[in-house]
Amino acid sequence: MSQITIALTKGRIEKDTVKLLTQAGFDMSFMADKGRSLIFESPDSRFRFLLVKGPDVTTYVRHGVADLGIVGKDILFEHPTGYLELLDLNFGLCKFSLASVPSYDPHDHKRKRIATKYPTVATDYFNQKGEDVEIISIQGSVEISPVLGLADAIVDIVETGHTLSANGLLVFEDICRVSARLIANQASLKNNPDIMPFVAKIESLVGRREVAFK
């Protein structure tokens, strides 16, 4: 049996993945007391898990260090190449939205400044609308950009909307749905015969979960 290395996004996606794999019948108890460790191997050596930041999941998969990766679709929009996207896992649900202060007019034809941590998503969104905008890349708290006058509006991930409302912002348009995805290294799919049966088992479970959610 060949070991499968899976790169996981630390945090909520990591926790939801552990729940999913437990429901699929895998013993994930070895992940319970992580401490500061970032690499974990299952007792039967079938799996090795790497806990990394979201953008790094695609890097580890692209270079073949990880066979599979579980990461938010928001990351895949910004890093679209070097892997195969296999499954929508139907957790980590949120959305991309256009938000700003209440006085913002989305129909104003002046050239707007848009602050975002996701320049590819923002650029594609405004290109589809036929609007020429200036994209300002922000790595930190993008919500304060319209309040301070740095930008006219923001494009950002929205889960509950609490952070937006706490900073006096409103959602003007929802752009697209975001969820966790299973990605794979193409060479690993070809060379490791244990990957596709594992993927099929997860796909079966995700399909049942999706039906249950409807």
Curated annotation (Swiss-Prot):
GO molecular function: ATP binding; ATP phosphoribosyltransferase activity
Name the UniProt record assigns to this protein: ATP phosphoribosyltransferase
Domain remarks: Lacks the C-terminal regulatory region which is replaced by HisZ.
Catalytic activity: 1-(5-phospho-beta-D-ribosyl)-ATP + diphosphate = 5-phospho-alpha-D-ribose 1-diphosphate + ATP
Species whose genome carries this gene: Streptococcus sanguinis (strain SK36)
Principal subcellular localization: cytoplasm
Disulfide partners: none
InterPro entries reported in the protein's UniProt record: ATP_PRibTrfase_cat, ATP_PRibTrfase_CS, ATP_PRibTrfase_HisG, ATP_PRibTrfase_HisG_short
Family in the record: Belongs to the ATP phosphoribosyltransferase family. Short subfamily.
Coiled coil regions, renumbered to chain: none
UniProt GO cellular component terms: cytoplasm
Enzyme Commission number, as recorded: 2.4.2.17
UniProt keyword list: Amino-acid biosynthesis, ATP-binding, Cytoplasm, Glycosyltransferase, Histidine biosynthesis, Nucleotide-binding, Transferase
Any single biological process term in GO: L-histidine biosynthetic process
UniProt function note: Catalyzes the condensation of ATP and 5-phosphoribose 1-diphosphate to form N'-(5'-phosphoribosyl)-ATP (PR-ATP). Has a crucial role in the pathway because the rate of histidine biosynthesis seems to be controlled primarily by regulation of HisG enzymatic activity.
Classification via PANTHER family: ATP PHOSPHORIBOSYLTRANSFERASE, ATP PHOSPHORIBOSYLTRANSFERASE ATP-PRTASE
Quaternary structure annotation from Swiss-Prot or TrEMBL: Heteromultimer composed of HisG and HisZ subunits.
Pathway where it operates: Amino-acid biosynthesis; L-histidine biosynthesis; L-histidine from 5-phospho-alpha-D-ribose 1-diphosphate: step 1/9
Compartment(s) of residence: Cytoplasm
Protein encoded by which gene: hisG
Superkingdom to which the source organism belongs: Bacteria
A Pfam cross-reference name: HisG
